[in-house]
């Protein structure tokens, strides 16, 4: 019995942590519920008064917005009941709230995304709430289509964008999936140029290193048995000769290549 209670408590703690961020929840992160909050109200004639029920819903911490008066800042769901008598100001008679530190369950079906909040304390009683989000892409805000409050259970049905899956554009912004293939290909084109430049740089460095090693080896062989000063003088002399002869060597190579090309073109012209 003790172990079962401990396990249930541990699961509840994990659930509480996940409840704070929809983007970290495997199911909620697929939906637009993290983008919206809603404040809906219904009005009933209760002679001699008028009763107004308000419901504030802000499931995800990603959407930061101030709640209405009498609701707490960390409420996921808050219900207010106001009673208005003729000629008098409204009186708030009921406040029930479900904050982000309570347990929850998430269920997705073909018709709706359902979020069940568990164990909100209201006086001496404990209540659960079931929020059903139905998708409607044509609506800019969620609207409350039905609500019931009975037997320590509250059920609200909302229709609007919160119950809709995120679009491909949202996935591209978040870097999810393979939807950004075109953008990736465009980003790879400059990488090819950078790769060619990098290859040439490495080739130049290898050639420079090979030349340096060659000059050092030749200088060492020519001054073997001598002092370091002899080696240094030999190395400087050979390096200087190499640098001074390099331009002439390059010109000779270029002239030979161009001369061969000219000879080939001349041969073709003669034919």
UniProtKB/Swiss-Prot annotation:
Residues 161-190 are annotated as: Disordered. Pfam families: ATG27. The keyword Transport applies. Residues 20-197 are lumenal. GO terms for biological process: autophagy; protein transport. The chain crosses the membrane at residues 198-218. One of its GO terms (cellular component) is phagophore assembly site membrane. Keywords: Autophagy, Cytoplasmic vesicle, Disulfide bond, Golgi apparatus, Membrane, Mitochondrion, Protein transport, Signal, Transmembrane, Transmembrane helix, Transport. Gene3D superfamilies: Mannose-6-phosphate receptor binding domain. Disulfide bonds join 22-60, 71-78, 135-164. It comes from the Eukaryota. Effector of VPS34 phosphatidylinositol 3-phosphate kinase signaling. Regulates the cytoplasm to vacuole transport (Cvt) vesicle formation. Plays a role in ATG protein retrieval from the pre-autophagosomal structure (PAS) and is especially required for autophagy-dependent cycling of ATG9. Forms a complex with ATG9 and ATG23. This is Autophagy-related protein 27.
